[in-house]
Amino acid sequence: MKKQNIRVGDKVFILAGNDKGKEGKVLSLTEDKVVVEGVNVRIKNIKRSQQNPKGKRISIEAPIHISNVRLTIAGEPAKLSVKVTEQGRELWQRRPDGTSQLYRLVRGKKG
């Protein structure tokens, strides 16, 4: 499995789809899909029941593929790469203009 640089709670930028150009917070994450707050909103119809005698329509965020989002740092979409230090720690590294800047540790790696 490829290492993912996106975690729940991160701010992301939408690269493709109907909501292209929007930003939002990651609500949930699976292996290849993310649910972003306020993005890819779908309307779901709830049938009539004893609790809802008239029925209702609710808005939910549908998942989008992880390749269609990019992590934002300081309000700009950022590409991250993995760097292995001399101690064997793996770090996410940001390269906005050719320079390297530490972003955070790769999840699950201790050192």
Curated annotation (Swiss-Prot):
Q: Does the keyword Zinc apply?
A: no
Task: Tell me the first and last residues of the signal peptide.
Answer: none
**Which residues fall in a coiled-coil region?**
none
One example GO MF annotation: structural constituent of ribosome
Alphabetical list of SMART domains matching this protein: KOW (SM00739)
Looking at the UniProt record for this protein, which Gene Ontology cellular component terms does it annotate, in alphabetical order? ribonucleoprotein complex; ribosome
Q: A single GO BP annotation from the record?
A: translation
Q: Which UniProt keywords apply?
A: Ribonucleoprotein, Ribosomal protein, RNA-binding, rRNA-binding
The record, for PROSITE patterns, names: RIBOSOMAL_L24 (PS01108)
Pfam family, any one: KOW
State the similarity comment: Belongs to the universal ribosomal protein uL24 family.
Its biological purpose: One of two assembly initiator proteins, it binds directly to the 5'-end of the 23S rRNA, where it nucleates assembly of the 50S subunit. One of the proteins that surrounds the polypeptide exit tunnel on the outside of the subunit.
Q: What is the annotated quaternary arrangement, including any partners?
A: Part of the 50S ribosomal subunit.
What is the protein's given name?
Answer: Large ribosomal subunit protein uL24
Task: State the species of origin.
Answer: Chlamydia pneumoniae (Chlamydophila pneumoniae)
Taxonomic lineage from the root: Bacteria, Pseudomonadati, Chlamydiota, Chlamydiia, Chlamydiales
